[in-house]
């Protein structure tokens, strides 16, 4: 509709321009015939008409420009916003279903991965629990359970002797028949049963310390043959003195008599 009105206005302007041309030609003819008064009046009227027509055309163009600016801006905004805001319900439902199923599949896959690492799945929980119970019952008599205190709290473990100690359960002496190790470890009566299981500590044999004995340094001096003979003479002298001493005593006793 706006384009149709615009074409009509252009046609009217063209017709007015043609009419003004004819009017100017007629005035020029009158001027040639020396009709000045009529020409002056005609020129004044033509000037007034042109001024009014120019004002009217300016107003029309301004109004048409404003009218064009408003509808052209609105459709552009609507065209840009339509695909974002107004979507078909089928498209949205399909997207919602696809996203919902994808989220469920991802969560289930994550849970299955976690359960496979732990050794369990959601498919058969009852069978697995039964199998676990059977396995635990079958393994109970084979495994040794640690003793429990009457107070209900286990004694603190020594982490230092953890590697070198072994805990043994309570063994009555009636079961030991000819076993020396069993008879040495068994307890007689329930009253003597210890609150804590006996521990056998495996002590490591200490390594023998090797001490090096200091070596005596012997110094050999060269001696002359005369020096070697001197101690023999010295040793012989006291023997003579010892042998001559009783004779000397006898001589003294005789002189006294």
From Swiss-Prot:
Residues 1-37 are cytoplasmic. Residues 204-222 have a biased composition (Basic residues). The record marks 65-66 as: Cleavage. GO terms for cellular component: extracellular region; host cell plasma membrane; membrane; virion membrane. Pfam families: Glycoprotein_G. Disulfide bonds join 173-186, 176-182. It comes from the Viruses. Glycans are attached at residues 72, 80, 85, 87, 92, 105, 139, 163, 199, 215, 233, 251, 253. Residues 187-198 are annotated as: Binding to host heparan sulfate. InterPro entries: G_prot. Residues 73-90, 150-166, 231-243 have a biased composition (Polar residues). Residues 67-257 are extracellular. The chain crosses the membrane at residues 38-66. Residues 70-92, 118-166, 204-257 are annotated as: Disordered. Keywords: Disulfide bond, Glycoprotein, Host cell membrane, Host membrane, Host-virus interaction, Membrane, Secreted, Transmembrane, Transmembrane helix, Viral attachment to host cell, Viral immunoevasion, Virion, Virus entry into host cell. GO terms for biological process: symbiont entry into host cell; virion attachment to host cell. Belongs to the pneumoviruses glycoprotein G family. This is Major surface glycoprotein G. The lineage of its organism: Viruses, Riboviria, Orthornavirae, Negarnaviricota, Haploviricotina.
């Amino acid at each position: 509709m706006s384009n149709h009105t615009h074409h009509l206005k252009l046609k009217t302007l063209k017709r007015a321009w043609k009419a003004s041309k004819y009017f100017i030609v007629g005035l020029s003819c009158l001027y040639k015939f020396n009709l000045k008064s009529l020409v002056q009046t005609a020129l004044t009227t033509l000037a007034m008409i042109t001024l009014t027509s120019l004002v009217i055309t300016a107003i029309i163009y301004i109004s048409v420009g404003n009218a064009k600016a408003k509808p052209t801006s609105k459709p552009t905004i609507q065209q840009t916003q339509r695909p974002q805001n107004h979507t078909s319900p089928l498209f949205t439902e399909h997207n919602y279903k696809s996203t919902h199923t994808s989220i469920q599949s991802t969560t289930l896959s994550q849970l299955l991965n976690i359960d496979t690492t732990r050794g369990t799945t959601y498919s058969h929980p009852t069978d697995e629990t039964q199998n676990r119970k059977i396995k635990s019952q079958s393994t109970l008599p084979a495994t040794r359970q640690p003793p429990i205190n009457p107070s209900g709290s286990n004694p603190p473990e020594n982490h230092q002797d953890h590697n070198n100690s072994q805990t043994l359960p309570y063994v009555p002496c009636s079961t030991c028949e000819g076993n020396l190790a069993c008879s040495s470890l068994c307890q007689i009566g329930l009253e003597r049963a210890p609150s804590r299981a006996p521990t056998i500590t495996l002590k490591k044999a200490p390594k023998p310390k090797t001490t090096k004995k200091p070596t005596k340094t012997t110094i050999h001096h060269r001696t002359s043959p005369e020096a070697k003979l001197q101690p023999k003479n010295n040793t012989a002298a006291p023997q003579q003195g010892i042998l001559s001493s009783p004779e000397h005593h006898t001589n003294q006793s005789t002189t006294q008599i």
